[in-house]
Design a protein with these regions (language model features):
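Short helix-loop capping/hinge motifs at secondary-structure junctions, enriched
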Residues: 70-76, 110, 169-175
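Periplasmic-binding protein-like
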Residues: 49-62, 152-181, 183-199, 201
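N-terminal segment of the mature folded domain
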Residues: 1-76
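A ligand-binding cleft/hinge motif common to bilobed small-molecule-binding domains
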Residues: 29-44, 129-158
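Hydrophobic residues within well-ordered alpha-helices
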Residues: 18-19, 101, 131-133
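Short beta-strand-to-loop elements that line the ligand-binding cleft
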Residues: 3-10, 112-124
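Short loop->beta-strand "edge-of-pocket" segments that line small-molecule binding or catalytic clefts
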Residues: 79-99
Length: 201
């Protein structure tokens, strides 16, 4: 069996923790094909070094707009969010979803100040979904699973890859070998496929 001590933090903070020796694995996510000059590329490239780090494919997942049941404001894009003045709830600096949002805003020709509530943030996908469910926000960007778990609607925006990063030197550790073997099993692949918005790599 593989036993994990899991700490939840944003993608950027997770990789920093890896580089500072505070963890063995760091999870982070990027678009399937991030542009070379994207904020994601500029954020993660300095933190990950070829030859020092190893990336392990973990999952594909969908990120999108988390909205109230029935999508009462008719939000289907970030343009809609900006144009409608919908109350948005963000993720904090250091989270991969904040990096993603800023990239998507730039692609859409939008600025942070175009989004009502851009400065308001919650620490997790679940907390964003809870804010929408409670009515303190109209919309946030997050994963489909968080929306479905709270009975909310979800508007897909992008496909991502979720990666696990480790140091090359950790690959021979028995626990790391066991984890990599587990990720290849059909049981794991089926479990991943059963989660809303997730798919195995």
């Amino acid at each position: 069996a593989v036993h994990l001590d899991i700490r939840f933090t944003g993608s950027v903070d997770a990789i920093r923790a890896l580089n500072e020796g505070r963890c063995t694995l760091a999870g982070f996510h990027t678009l399937e094909q991030p542009d070379a000059d994207s904020l994601a590329a500029r954020t993660y490239r300095p933190l990950l070094q070829p030859g020092l780090h190893k990336l392990i494919g973990f999952a594909r997942r969908t990120q999108g707009l988390i909205v109230a049941p029935g999508n009462p404001l008719g939000l289907h894009s970030l343009d809609d969010v900006a144009r409608s003045g919908a109350r948005f709830v963000n993720r904090p600096l250091g989270s991969g979803t904040r990096v993603l949002l800023d990239d998507l805003l730039a692609r859409a020709g939008l600025a942070p100040e175009d989004i009502t509530g851009y400065a308001q943030h919650e620490p997790s996908h679940g907390a964003v979904a809870q804010a929408v469910a409670a009515g303190s926000a109209d919309v946030g960007v997050g994963i489909e699973l968080a929306a479905r778990m709270r009975g909310l609607d979800f508007v897909p925006l992008v496909q991502e890859r979720y990666h696990l990063a480790c140091l090359q030197s950790a690959l021979e550790q028995p626990a790391m070998q066991a984890l990599r073997a587990l990720l290849q099993t059909s049981a794991w692949q089926q479990e991943m496929a059963s989660m809303a918005g997730y798919a195995p790599l």
